[in-house]
C-alpha cells in the first residue's frame, strides 16, 4: 500500500501556555500563587495550563486507592480557586464527566491518580477536539494529549512551522 504524503501544518504561536510541575510532597497551595503570577504576566485571556499538577481534582473519579489526606486538600482547593479566578476548565472532566482514567500509578499499580491534565480558558473550550490519557513508557506517568482546532488565520508572518 502507498503511504500518505506527510502534511506540514503551520501553528500560530500564542503566549498562553504555562507548564506546571506541582510539588510532589507536602501540601503547598502557595506554589500556585506563582502560577497565577505567570498567567498575569502573560496578559492573555486564552490560557492552556498543562502539566503534572501532582494533585487529584476529583477524589471519587480521578483516584484509585489514593487517600484524600495524602492528596493535598489545601492545594486542591487552591487549584479550584485558580480555575474560578481565570475561568479555566478541566478538559478531561468536561469531556468525560464520569470516566475513570489515570495518568500516574505507583510501581505496583495499586495507587493511581489523574495527576496530569489540561486546564483551558472557558472561551477556548469550544475549540477542543479531544483529550486523551495515553500509555506510559518507562515512567510512572502516562502521556496526556490535548487536541485543539485553531480558529485563527494561519497565513501571516507571525506563524511558524
Where in this protein do the model-derived segments appear?
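A shared catalytic/ligand-binding motif for oxyanion handling
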Residues: 1-161
Amino acid at each position: 500500500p502507498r503511504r500518505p504524503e506527510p502534511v506540514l501544518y503551520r501553528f500560530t504561536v500564542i503566549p498562553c501556555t504555562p507548564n506546571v510541575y506541582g510539588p510532589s510532597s507536602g501540601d503547598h497551595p502557595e506554589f500556585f500563587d506563582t502560577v497565577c503570577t505567570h498567567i498575569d504576566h502573560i496578559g492573555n485571556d486564552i490560557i492552556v495550563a498543562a502539566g503534572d499538577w501532582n494533585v487529584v481534582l476529583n477524589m471519587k473519579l480521578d483516584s484509585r486507592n489514593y487517600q484524600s489526606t495524602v492528596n493535598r486538600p489545601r492545594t486542591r482547593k487552591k487549584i479550584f480557586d485558580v480555575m474560578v479566578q481565570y475561568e479555566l476548565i478541566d478538559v478531561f472532566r468536561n469531556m468525560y464527566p464520569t470516566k475513570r482514567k489515570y495518568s500516574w500509578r505507583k510501581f505496583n499499580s495499586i495507587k493511581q491518580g489523574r495527576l496530569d491534565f489540561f486546564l483551558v480558558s472557558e472561551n477556548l473550550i469550544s475549540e477542543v477536539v479531544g483529550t486523551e490519557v495515553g500509555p506510559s513508557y518507562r515512567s510512572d506517568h502516562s502521556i496526556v494529549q490535548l487536541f485543539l482546532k485553531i480558529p485563527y488565520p494561519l497565513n501571516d508572518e507571525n506563524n511558524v512551522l
